C-alpha cells in the first residue's frame, strides 16, 4: 500500500520531525510512506471570513494538485466521523482488500480544509472534537496508522 500524508505548512519543530521520522521508519515495514508538504498561504493574523475562505481555497488548490485521480482520500476534519484504533485498522484492511493501493490522508492548515478538498475526500476522519495543532496531527496520525498495521497483523504494540 502507498500512503501519502499531505499537509499544509513546513514542519519546523525538531521534536515533531524526530517523532515523524521514527514512525515513518517503522511504517516502512508495512507500506510505502510519502510525506508531502504544500506551502501555507501567507496571511495576516486577523482575517475576514472572505479572506479566510481565500486562504483555504489557495491551500486547497495546492493539496488537490498532489492527489492522483485513483487515490482514496481521507480528510482529517473536525466534522468527520470518529473511529477507534480498531476501526481505523478495519478501514485500512478494507482498503487493501478492495485494491485501494493509494491512500492519502490530508491535513489542512490552521484554518482547516477548503470545500473543494472536503468534496474530493472519500472519507472524513476526526480524531476528536478538540482542535489540535495541524503540525502535531502529522505525528498523531502516523502513530495511529502504524498502530492499525500492527493490529491487522496481530503484532504486539496495541493497548
Curated annotation (Swiss-Prot):
| Primary location recorded for the protein, binned into one broad class | cytoplasm
Q: What is its EC number?
A: 2.1.1.177
Q: Which UniProt keywords apply?
A: Cytoplasm, Methyltransferase, rRNA processing, S-adenosyl-L-methionine, Transferase
The record's subcellular locations are: Cytoplasm
Q: Which family does it belong to?
A: Belongs to the RNA methyltransferase RlmH family.
Q: Please give one Gene Ontology molecular function term for this protein.
A: rRNA (pseudouridine-N3-)-methyltransferase activity
Species per Swiss-Prot/TrEMBL record: Halalkalibacterium halodurans (strain ATCC BAA-125 / DSM 18197 / FERM 7344 / JCM 9153 / C-125)
Name of this chain's protein:
Ribosomal RNA large subunit methyltransferase H
SUPFAM superfamilies for the chain: alpha/beta knot (SSF75217)
The record lists the catalysed reaction(s) as: pseudouridine(1915) in 23S rRNA + S-adenosyl-L-methionine = N(3)-methylpseudouridine(1915) in 23S rRNA + S-adenosyl-L-homocysteine + H(+)
What Gene3D superfamilies has UniProt attached to this entry? 3.40.1280.10
Subunit structure, briefly? Homodimer.
Pfam families associated with the record: SPOUT_MTase
- NCBIfam families linked to this entry: PRK00103.1-3, tRNA_RlmH_YbeA
For the keyword Metal-binding, the answer is no
Function statement? Specifically methylates the pseudouridine at position 1915 (m3Psi1915) in 23S rRNA.
Q: What is the lineage of its organism?
A: Bacteria, Bacillati, Bacillota, Bacilli, Bacillales
Which principal EC class is assigned to this enzyme?
transferase
CDD domains attached here?
Answer: RlmH-like (cd18081)
Q: Where are the transmembrane segments?
A: none
An example GO CC term for this entry is:
cytoplasm
Residues involved in S-adenosyl-L-methionine binding: 76, 108, 127-132
Amino acid at each position: 500500500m502507498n500512503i501519502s500524508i499531505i499537509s499544509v505548512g513546513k514542519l519546523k519543530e525538531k521534536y515533531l520531525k524526530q517523532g515523524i521520522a521514527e514512525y515513518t521508519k517503522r511504517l516502512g515495514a508495512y507500506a510505502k510512506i510519502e510525506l508531502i508538504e504544500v506551502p501555507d498561504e501567507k496571511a495576516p493574523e486577523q482575517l475576514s471570513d472572505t479572506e479566510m475562505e481565500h486562504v483555504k481555497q489557495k491551500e486547497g488548490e495546492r493539496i488537490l494538485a498532489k492527489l492522483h485521480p485513483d487515490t482514496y482520500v481521507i480528510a482529517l476534519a473536525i466534522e468527520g466521523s470518529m473511529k477507534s484504533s480498531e476501526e481505523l485498522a478495519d478501514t485500512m484492511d478494507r482498503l487493501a482488500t478492495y485494491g485501494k493501493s493509494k491512500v492519502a490522508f490530508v491535513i489542512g492548515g490552521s484554518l482547516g480544509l477548503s470545500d473543494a478538498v472536503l468534496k474530493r475526500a472519500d472519507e472524513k476522519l476526526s480524531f476528536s472534537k478538540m482542535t489540535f495543532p495541524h503540525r502535531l496531527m502529522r505525528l498523531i496520525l502516523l502513530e495511529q496508522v502504524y498502530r492499525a498495521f500492527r493490529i491487522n497483523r496481530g503484532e504486539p504494540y496495541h493497548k
